[in-house]
Structure formats: structure tokens, C-alpha cells
Amino acid sequence: MNATDTTVTELATTPAGTLAADRPPGTGVHAGPVTIRHRDFSPSIHPDAYVAPTAVLSGQVSVGAGSCIMHGAVLAAQGGPVQVGAGCVIMENAVLRGTVPHPLRIGDRVLAGPHTQLTGCTIADETFLAAGAMVGYGAHLGRAASAGLGAVVHIGAVVAPQGRIPAGWVAVGDPAHAYPPSQAEAIRTALAGTGWSFLPFILGIDDAGGRRDQLRTALARYTTAMASHHRQDQLLPPADAVDDDHVW
């Protein structure tokens, strides 16, 4: 390290904006994220939030004060809004989707780890979701709950405040009961007892038919709906270049 290098400690203790004048033109400056106008709705990002330039926000998406949306994250309002509260961290490659009739609502001070998938669910304040966790339609995690690495909170499951779903386990029911992955038969039985089934619930497909026919019907409906739903999407102009010293 030479005398002109800046250490991480110095960055962390330097008031925002004071380093920019010492940098070559263009250093530490980025364009805004990819934002898409969808069905007359455009994303809303609080001025104090940070959204990485490679993140994608589509439609009725709101990001609260002090929240950070990291690289590769996708926040898509596909008929229902996506709301991210204040002080949240949505990490790399997370996918957050709001649908009809299930919006996605995330409270304050929530951490969603890399590759998490959250669809049409409610995540209360101060919840922790480890990398690869999945939360399905209509599910609810109470305040200060947690889902471990690769855990699944199934469609319609309700996890109590401070409830913990261990890594790799599957939560089913209201109130939720967590099963280890080794109990596949118990998981299937529990799911059958909830009345929640993906194809009938999401796509209106009769569960009684053969699997092959079900998938053919499902994909025909899904591709048609998605194409129609997004045909009028409009890529918004990039935001003005912003200095990212504030991240430190």
C-alpha cells in the first residue's frame, strides 16, 4: 500500500462526499438501477436507500429509507405491489415478487440473504432469511422470525413471532410446523391437509388430471398470461449518476 491508498477504516470514518473530489473523474460513480414502468406503475425508491446498478425493479415497487438492494436482486410487482420497509438489506440475486391477490410486504430491518425467493408473502419486522430461503404465496413470518439456509416456508404457512425454521427444513400449515427434509411423506401429508396446492391455487388447474396434462395446461396459461401481462412494459431512463460514498 502506498501513501495515497485509502484504507477501509478511513472510508468508514470519512464523512460522505469528502472523498469524491480526490478521485479521478468517474471513479465511485454509478448509474441508477434498471427500473421498469409496468401497468402505469413505476418503482419508488427513498432518497436515503441504496439500490445497486445491476438490480431490477419493475412496477409498483417501493423501497424504504436506509434500505440496501444489492447486485442482481429482482423486485417485480406482477399484479401486486412489492413493499420493502426501512433499514432492510436485500442481498445478491434475491427474487421478490408481488402477485394478484398476494402482494409482497416486507417490514423494517429485515435481511433477505443471497438467492432468497419471496413470493406474495408477508415478512414482519426484524426477520432474518438466510441464503436460499424460500417463502411462498400467502405465507406470513412474524416479527423476529428466522428461516435458515435453504429453508422453505410453504404456501399459506404462518410462522409465529420469533419462530425459527432450521436450515433445509420445510414449514407447513397455520400455525406452521417445521419438518426436516428426511420426512418427505410427512411433508406431503401435511401439505394435502392444508388444502393449498400449487397448480390449483396459482393457475386454477384441476389436480385430478394426469401430471403431464396438468403441466401442458399450466404452461399454456402461464405463458399467455405472462406475455400479455408484460407486453406494455417500459424501460425507464437511467437515473442521474449518483456518488456512492454514502454506502460507506
Residue ranges and their predicted role:
Residues 51, 62, 69, 84-90:
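Well-ordered beta-strand segments characteristic of repetitive beta-sheet solenoids
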Residues 52, 84-85, 106, 118:
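Hydrophobic residues on conserved beta-strands that form the core of alpha/beta folds
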Residues 51-52, 153:
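Short, structured beta-strand/loop micro-motifs enriched in basic residues and often containing a Trp
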Residues 55, 73, 82, 90-96, ...:
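N-terminal leader/targeting segments and the first structural element of proteins
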Residues 3-40, 78, 92-93, 99-106, ...:
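Glycine-rich hexapeptide-repeat left-handed beta-helix
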